[in-house]
A protein has these predicted regions:
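Polysaccharide-binding surfaces and accessory modules of carbohydrate-active proteins
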Residues: 3-178
Length: 178
């Protein structure tokens, strides 16, 4: 939304028409950190962040933590573009689900860039005919610097307060509960 930060406004069952009720509202955020000191109505700490990075005033757990050669860990990824394609893109050399035809799925790829550090982050969302969503992330270092990855999650899901039921399926290697 603001300054090319990526947020989401809905996560749930399929919707036929967009409803403005889920849009983000701007009002004075009080003591929240603001990326723009002249705008008190926007804070990363209160925005439903799609893929939060480290050190920018969002005090929730980040989806990624990187360390640069100078010891700095701050990143500042901004929205850079997107592409929608038929079928499913697959992470290289990693297990994944497959489709037999490109008609079975659609993939959204969102690009984020950290211009200061020379990094490109790609977020992949594949939705299947049966309303299943899969996600993965890739990062590309376009600089000459060495970057150490401490944390790089496939997704971050920032849900508002509601009465949720949580189901967890514990297991171990070859003993998964499914």
């Amino acid at each position: 939304e603001n300054n090319c930060y990526l947020s989401h406004c809905y996560f749930g069952k399929r919707i036929r028409r967009w409803n403005e009720a889920a849009k983000m509202y701007y009002y004075d955020r009080g003591f929240c950190a603001n990326p723009d000191e002249t705008d008190r109505t926007f804070s990363l700490d209160t925005m439903p962040g799609e893929y939060p990075d480290f050190g920018q005033g969002d005090f929730r757990s980040p989806a990624m933590e990187l360390e640069f050669q100078d010891g700095d860990r701050n990143t500042r990824f901004h929205y850079a573009g997107y592409q929608i394609s038929a079928g499913k893109l697959s992470p290289e050399k990693l297990p994944h689900v497959y489709v037999e035809s490109d008609k079975e799925a659609m993939t959204l790829e969102i690009w984020m860039k950290d211009e200061v550090r020379g990094l490109r982050l790609s977020l992949y969302y594949t939705i299947y005919e049966d309303a299943v969503l899969t996600r993965f992330v890739s990062i590309k270092n376009e600089s000459e610097d060495i970057v150490k990855i401490h944390r790089l999650l496939s997704m971050s899901l920032d849900l508002g307060e509601q009465d949720y039921d949580i189901l967890t399926l514990g297991g171990a290697h070859t003993e998964e509960k499914n």
